[in-house]
């Protein structure tokens, strides 16, 4: 053995096994490239990314830690997401959750007059979280 040498097994390493998977189609509708990292809460990804946000709630990309997926302007691709494990609490990112991952906390706009409707350029059709406020 050489000092500092790391000896690893020659077998393949499985990541995120035993976690339910979700596949969604994502399109970059913006005019700049967007990169999303492995542990970023995909639900809170850049608003120029068009996808079914509710399906991404509580999930991150199913890729190795430290990796990222890049979306060039106009790109449309499928990505695989997995649920967060552990205590299932999310803080930071875009500040849309800041607490436990709980479907009852997902804010759903009620009509076109809702002050938060249209945040994602969809006239309120998408679901967004309103700083932990419970839906009615």
Swiss-Prot record:
Assigned protein family: Belongs to the urease beta subunit family.
Record pathway: Nitrogen metabolism; urea degradation; CO(2) and NH(3) from urea (urease route): step 1/1
GO biological process: urea catabolic process
Name of the protein this chain belongs to: Urease subunit beta
One GO cellular component, as annotated: urease complex
EC class name: hydrolase
Assigned keywords, A-Z: Cytoplasm, Hydrolase
Chief location: cytoplasm
Catalytic activity annotation: urea + 2 H2O + H(+) = hydrogencarbonate + 2 NH4(+)
Region of interest: Disordered: 113-136
Stored PANTHER family: UREASE (PTHR33569:SF1)
Cell compartment(s), UniProt: Cytoplasm
